[in-house]
């Protein structure tokens, strides 16, 4: 009897201890969530960008792999869709080099569903992963052995779904299918992967641009807005800077990591200051990485460990380069006194030779070079009907030692425009003049050069300025260039220099404080008194108050700052624990237990200098 009583008391004591532990954990979680809710308060934060500008617009994302969509559009596509855009996400390959197509495609659909985008908005072209298909080499799927497009169980590849047959794995067929899917849906906006250091990113980028060349030359009335983005340098391999007092914007990759360190980006003609910066929906932001919608989506890509790179991928903006599609030269007849005229209106800024894989790929098949002995060095552009022209854009041979130093444009009406030295890095040199009407042809003649004179592209526009189809203003920290949302300052900060990014670089804007005490605006600088706590600041485009951005600025006390620093340590720990959980889940869900154990054993062998496995 006495023994039973003792056992019951022990059980009761154990239960009490367990309940106390559970309550303690719940209390910690409640405190954590309360503090996080305070930090994440977006009351007063607002931007007009996603409200209605994409309603009834068609937006298409074109990427190589199932997860690349999150790298280039994961933070902007969901708010577009939620605000009325008709979206399509096109995956060019099955991502099936080491993992089955079914696994990759299931992960992609699950991830997009986490962002509110349904499965029926997803298209799989079904081409192989990790091959040299793009340069004409024979290709097959590493995981399935197939030599034609296919999809995993329960999915269909685009070519079979559209035409009833699978397409052979050839470069030409991939270009055909990209062209077909674009013309079938005719998107208003295309967000496409750009040429970076990944072989499939390079190949799909070039394939897309070849498809766009065909479209622009045969569909003169269809000129979608094209925004291109680097998936590796600006996301997957970017700086892991999520854990900061305020969210950081995308940073330029260190030059030594580029395909050619001579240039700012992997595409020589892109300048960092010319990038298009789209803001992030405030609802997707959090000081906890686990709360960010992008992380929740990345967590669905178990096989790729994509979630491990969230610190690099999640930023305060999404960065693109605009590629104009309205050039009059796409439907013009172009001839040259020497060189290859076909390269001058092909939409492609760069090309490759016999490989897309490996570091420092040689860029070729993109510049039309004049013969050294050619005394004329002239390009002639003839239109099929009279045009109005107000701008000619010239892209120099991007070899830094080969530059056109001067030239002249002569129009069929006899008028001439002098051309200064072109940008040596091959970036766009815009020659703008008063509109010339009834132009049927013009020539560009090189008058001075060094090295090998040549051109990458020649474009002509009716309107010098380009309308992106949307209006945007976004406040930023003028000193760091980071976009601002709910901004926290430390106790000793006395001022904050504000700037703004506008979709129209020529647009003026007005900044004003709409709420808050003990703060004043001196020019574009917020000046805080010692007793400042919080304010709300609004920026509006001059003449268009419907285009606005609104931010909050809050000062942390010394206690709050210390609390925040402790909070961030907890956040980092929670992130590490969750990534470990997801790695373990991947081992069992995708059946990688043996492979992981084998890799672990091999790592031990390498360290010990012995061989115990086969």
Residue ranges and their predicted role:
Residues 13-20, 26-221:
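Active-site beta-strand->loop->alpha-helix modules in alpha/beta enzyme cores, enriched
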Residues 1-12:
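N-terminal Lys/Arg-rich, disordered targeting/topogenic segments
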Residues 469-507, 569:
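Solvent-exposed, low-complexity, repeat-rich "mucin-like" stalks and linkers
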């Amino acid at each position: 009897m006495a023994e039973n009583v003792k056992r019951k008391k022990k059980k009761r004591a154990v239960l009490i201890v367990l309940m106390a532990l559970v309550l303690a954990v719940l209390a910690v979680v409640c405190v954590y969530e309360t503090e996080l809710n305070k930090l994440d308060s977006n009351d007063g934060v607002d931007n007009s960008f996603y409200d209605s500008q994409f309603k009834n617009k068609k937006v298409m994302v074109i990427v190589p792999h199932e997860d690349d969509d999150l790298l280039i559009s994961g933070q902007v596509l969901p708010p577009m869709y939620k605000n009325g855009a008709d979206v399509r996400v096109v995956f060019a390959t099955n991502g099936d080099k080491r993992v089955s197509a079914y696994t990759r495609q299931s992960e992609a659909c699950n991830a997009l569903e986490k962002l509110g985008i349904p499965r029926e908005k997803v298209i799989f072209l079904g081409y192989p992963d990790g091959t040299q298909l793009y340069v004409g080499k024979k290709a097959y799927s590493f995981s399935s052995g197939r030599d034609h497009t296919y999809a995993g169980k329960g999915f269909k590849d685009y070519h079979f779904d559209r035409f009833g047959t699978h397409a052979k794995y050839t470069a030409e067929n991939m270009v055909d299918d990209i062209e077909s899917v674009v013309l079938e849906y005719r998107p208003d906006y295309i967000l496409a992967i750009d040429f970076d250091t990944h072989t499939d990113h390079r190949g799909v980028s070039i394939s897309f641009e070849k498809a766009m060349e065909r479209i622009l030359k045969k569909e003169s009335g269809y000129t979608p807005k094209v925004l291109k983005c680097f998936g590796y340098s600006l996301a997957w391999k970017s700086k892991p800077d999520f854990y900061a007092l305020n969210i950081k914007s995308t940073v330029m990759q260190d030059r030594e990591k580029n395909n050619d360190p001579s240039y700012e980006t992997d595409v020589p003609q892109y300048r960092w200051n010319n990038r298009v910066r789209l803001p992030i929906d405030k609802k997707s932001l959090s000081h906890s990485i686990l709360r960010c919608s992008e992380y929740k989506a990345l967590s669905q890509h178990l096989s790729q460990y994509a979630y491990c790179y969230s610190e690099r991928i999640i930023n305060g903006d999404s960065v693109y380069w605009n590629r104009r599609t309205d050039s009059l030269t796409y439907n013009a007849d172009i001839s040259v006194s020497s060189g290859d005229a076909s390269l001058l209106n092909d939409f492609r800024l760069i090309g490759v030779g016999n490989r897309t894989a490996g570091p420092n790929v040689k860029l070729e098949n993109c510049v039309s070079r004049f013969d050294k002995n050619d005394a004329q060095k002239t390009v002639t552009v003839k239109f099929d009907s009279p045009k109005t022209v107000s701008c000619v854009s010239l892209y120099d041979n991007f070899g830094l030692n080969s530059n056109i130093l001067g030239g002249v444009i002569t129009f069929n009406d006899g008028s001439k425009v002098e051309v200064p030295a072109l940008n040596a890095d091959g970036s766009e040199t815009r020659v703008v003049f008063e509109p010339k009407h009834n132009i049927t042809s013009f020539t560009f003649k090189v008058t001075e050069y060094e090295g090998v004179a040549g051109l990458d592209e020649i474009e002509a526009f009716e309107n010098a300025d380009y309308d992106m189809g949307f209006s945007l203003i976004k406040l930023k920290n003028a000193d760091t260039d980071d976009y601002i949302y709910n901004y926290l300052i430390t106790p000793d900060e006395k001022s904050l220099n504000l700037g703004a990014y506008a979709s129209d670089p020529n647009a003026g804007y007005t900044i004003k404080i709409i709420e808050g005490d003990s703060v004043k605006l001196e020019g574009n600088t917020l000046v805080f008194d010692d007793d400042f706590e919080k304010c709300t600041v609004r920026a509006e485009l001059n003449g268009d108050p419907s285009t606005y951005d609104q931010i909050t600025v809050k000062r942390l006390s010394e206690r709050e700052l210390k609390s925040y620093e402790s909070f961030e340590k907890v956040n980092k720990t929670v992130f590490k624990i969750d990534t470990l959980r997801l790695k373990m889940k991947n081992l069992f869900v995708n059946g990688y237990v043996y492979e992981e154990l084998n890799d672990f054993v091999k790592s031990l062998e390498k360290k010990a200098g012995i061989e115990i496995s086969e």
